[in-house]
A protein has these predicted regions:
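Short conserved catalytic/interaction loops centered on acidic-Pro-aromatic/His motifs
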Residues: 124-135, 152-156
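A metal-dependent hydrolase signature that marks the N-terminal structural subdomain at the beginning
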Residues: 1-85, 95-102, 181
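Active-site recognition of the HExxH zinc-binding catalytic motif
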Residues: 112-125, 137
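Short, small-residue-rich loop/turn micro-motifs
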Residues: 88-90
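Short pre-active-site segment immediately N-terminal to the catalytic Zn-binding motif
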Residues: 92-113, 128-129
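An active-site-proximal "capping" alpha-helix that borders the catalytic cofactor pocket
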Residues: 132-147
Length: 185
């Protein structure tokens, strides 16, 4: 945990998050294999207002303006270490209050983005050039999110699966009753 504490930095300009994003990211990093974080200097939590004017106008390779993206992975270049930026204001922009208040949903929301960006970093350090960048990052994020969910919330599987089966049973019964009522008319 101490290694991950120094890895996460906050750099906001005139912005205060409604939740402790740093703590959320630190929790998520505990489920990342240490070798996948090799050569990664920091994970910077920031907002788009903290971007310079020049960087706000920059575009991603997909054509999206940098001011609209959720995260970005910067690789080692000209002696500068690799780091990841997460744009917290963009991530939380359309999120409902109950998604923020429930740690499980908040963790899943940030896990998808953080693990995706770490996936870009892992692809570079592992020289996995055969797979397209976004495909590799998405698969990596899905694998780590699944691992995180099973280890952190595994106890819910024993509770939720039977509950879902019961709910689906009720839904089938309701549909059958509706069909019979429609036939009688």
């Amino acid at each position: 945990m101490s290694q991950n504490t120094s890895l996460v930095q906050e750099n906001y300009k005139d912005y205060t998050s409604q939740v402790n994003v740093k703590k959320t990211v630190q929790i998520l990093l505990n489920y990342v294999p240490p070798e996948d974080l090799a050569h990664l200097q920091s994970i910077v939590l920031t907002n788009t207002a903290a971007l310079s004017r020049k960087r706000k106008r920059q575009r991603r390779s997909s054509g999206a303006p940098l001011s609209r993206v959720l995260g970005r992975c910067y690789q080692r270049w000209k002696g500068q270490p690799a780091y990841i930026e997460l744009y917290v204001d963009n991530i939380l922009e359309d999120v409902s209050w109950y998604d923020l208040r429930l740690p499980m949903f908040r963790n899943w929301m940030f896990a998808k983005i953080l693990y995706h960006e770490i996936g870009h970093h892992v692809q570079v350090i592992s020289n996995a050039k055969l797979v397209k960048e976004e495909v590799f990052a998405e698969k990596y994020a899905a694998r780590l999110k699944k691992r995180f969910s099973r280890q952190r919330y595994g106890y819910l599987r024993r509770f939720l699966l039977p509950l879902i089966k019961v709910c689906l049973g009720f839904i089938r019964i309701i549909k059958l009753v509706k069909k019979r009522l429609v036939r009688k008319k």
